[in-house]
Swiss-Prot record:
Keywords: Metal-binding, Phosphoprotein, Zinc, Zinc-finger. Zn(2+) 2 binds at residues 927, 930, 957, 960. Residues 409-448 have a biased composition (Acidic residues). Residues 559-608 have a biased composition (Basic residues). This is Lateral signaling target protein 2 homolog. It comes from Drosophila willistoni (Fruit fly).
Amino acid sequence: MCDDGAVCAATAAANADDKSLLARFYHADRSLTAVASELDSFDGRAEPDRCSRLVSRLRQNQDKVLAITNLIMEELLGEDRDPRAFRAKFPEEVLQENLAGQLWFGAECLAAGSSILNRETESKEMRPLAQAVTKSLGNVRVLLRDQCLRNNVPNSKTLHLDFNDCTTEQLYESLKIFDRLFAEFELSYVSAMVQVKSRHEYEMQQWIGVLFSETLQRALKMGLLDQEMVDAFDPGLMFSIPRLAIVAGLVVYNKGPLNMDMPGDQLSEMFRPFRTILIKIRDLLRNLNQQELYQLEKLLCTNEDINTKAPLGSSSIEAPSQQDYSTANTHRTLERLTVDQRNNNNNINNNSSSSSNSNSGAPSVQEDANHRSPSMLSLSTASPTPSHSIGSTFSAATSSTNPPVNWSDGDDADDDDDGDDDDEDDDDDVDDDLVGNDDSDDDDDDTTDEHLLDDIVAADCASGYLIPNTNLGNLLQPQQVTLTDNFVASDDDDGYGQVAAGAGNDEEPSTSAATRHMQRLHLPSSDSYGDADGSHNNTTTIKSPDSDGQQQHQQHTSSRQRHSHHHHRHHHHHHRHSSHSSHSHHHQHQQHHSQPHPHRTTRSGRKRCSLESPTDVDVTVVQPEPEPELVSASADNSTASSLSDDISLAMRNTTARLKFKSTENLLHRLFVCIAGVADQLQTNFASDLRQILRSVFLMNVSSSQEEIDDIPEKTKESELFEFRASENDVIQESAGSNQSIYSAEEVNPELDNVFSASGARHSAGASMQRNHTTIDNNNSTSSSPPDATITTTTTTTTTRSHVTRSRSLGDQEVVASAAAAAAAAVNEEREMQRQRNNSVGSNTPSSASSSATSSSSEQNSPVSMRSGTGRRRHQSNNETQMPTTATTTTTTGTGTLAPPAWIPDGKAPRCMSCQTPFTAFRRRHHCRNCGGVFCGVCSNASAPLPKYGLTKAVRVCRDCYAREIRSSGGGGGGVVQMQRQQAANRPQTASAS
């Protein structure tokens, strides 16, 4: 046994070029053992440089040993291998070819007692598993070395093991154990090193891919993107699709993966860090109408200028009418609210106390009062109508000469008088941004307020309340104002002058802290306010006297004309009204409304307005513990009470956009925020985003493009990818051109006149086919003399160059006389393909015709027997079709062949030599000599290919390498035979020549 083993070992050592799996494992394992022994023979701390070099070599040898072991397990275990579907959850950067070596190195370190940095707990848990992995791998190495000495067959592509031998059975079981342990350790180790997706996260990523795909299809239907961009994989779509997906996921498919109402831990990790800003973006997007949303999406796609120049409010969602009470762009809670437009019209036209009484308790009107439609944002912003002016909540104090609202006790009223005037200059710009004030019309306030009031009241009756939300973050706030949720601003008092002292007598005072709070905010005097602090249980009643009715009527007549021109300036105008005028305006407002206008419900209480009589109006604020008589005054508003929470949320959405001075400003801010989030995905989640976008492109590519990719034999689009100069290879054509070729289209000056005659030089065959352009190879050959730098050219070389060139440009010309020969060639090629898959070489005799410069190595080249999808070459036995002007059969050493076409990766699921399936770790490699697809082991050789113009060493497969090395420059029949065999797959082109 020992003698036989020694003989086998000596034989294996002598045959170092043996390419069988067992022999390769034997030599790789010996090299690894030698490096490990050297590494253990000295103190690494004394010689750190040497230790570092040896560790690098050790890891390389570990990679090699594990790669060969993996091939052996693929062949022996087959379907019994442990599944590794968990790799789909790994980040893309983890899936590398040397991952197995890293895992082995990590297992040895853990087994030796080391720990992963900052992962002490995980290291302790994985240490027993790491010890089991290293022990199992050592056992497998011993058994495989024994099999190398027992059952190795030199240069065998398969394992020849004796399955009746107990050692073979032991090897089989050991491989199964090692495979299971190594897979378990791989998952544990990678999970400890990087973040691995959970099942829920993986499903959420798939849903995000669906969202991206739906977004792309929606953009195509809307005309935002073109199908040509998708088919061409336009890089700009890498940025446009995520941006559009954020918009669509927030407002269009709002129940999908970007549903911000779900808990944060259920969101995808891609969008979880941006949850807060996405909620704010959603709130603003819901207030955009269709035109504004389209402009925003167009801006996100093209970065073009915004065309919307209208004011913010005029371009928002339309007001509810008698037929249509809501629009699709408003919040879903708005859709549940209705507006009694007929009552509103009666209120505007009649101005009667009976109308006011008849509608004072209508629930539908109560709902409308609590929830203003965003269509009238500009009017409500510019309106001094009681309970409706909202801009004051976001701006500081505007210019005002009157004292603020009497929120506190009588002795605090005088203190409030001085607060607004001091800061009016500092805050005018803020107010101008929101409502567009103009100081030029201050002198006309006393004469034009009636008409302004009339139009504003009509608008307010039709659109309800707008209560500001004050919780938005600084990112979406163009104006930095310190606002809280502890107060709700309304316009009942201040819009038409301050409340008179007499009215304050009937008012139960609120706390002085609330008054000081409002003073600090410098809210404009055009607004009236409810309770400043919802935590206090108090009731404020503001009564309007009878004597103010006449003045209201006069002002109502005169304000109509002014409002049409200056409705955006009402805040500034009405800050200078007297307190008596304030009562009159308030009374007139109640006549026009003739229904209650409840305020926004705060955290601690609910505010309502009720009408008691045509002349005496009580604006009642109901807190959690109100007095009984005040509760009875608003008992008929139960419908609005049940919807108060939804209304409060909707009000935040509809009024958030009032912080922006124009629609353009709002859209620009949304663009910045959305683009910022989407671009962050490109950086923080690049791997996941690439996978999602790749799937989206594959799902949405046009059908014609899919056919081109799937059937390259018919369309010859794959010819564009038959050669890639990724190794700095330069192809020199017969004319001496030194251009680098990055596609299938070669540089051939002999056909320049052909392309100039046909119009333009195309890079793809499809474009030539669409233009119905054909190239006559016979004519081009006879009329195009060779370049001056070429001394002689054979008929075969010229014809091959012309036909190959025509083929790469989509020449589909068919000659009927060659149909029979083509059919025979197809059968011959199929037989050759079967032989190629089952054998290494070919003994097919060469053709009688030959070329002097073609090496004899091509006679047995696997090019002639590889798959016909990407390695076919033109048939060269067509001298009878060539003109008599080219009769020589010799060629110079400067003539080169066209590079072989590459087989597409999708057409080669297995290595064409060892038949090993490709995985994420076993990558595909193309042989530059035959175009076949091989694994890294079967294509690890390199050799120059001067016949293709490749003077530097390039990657070739083992078979081609052996033939190139063994070739001695004999007869050239191999080229002709290769061309005949490859022409069988392309009978049309062959016959056309």
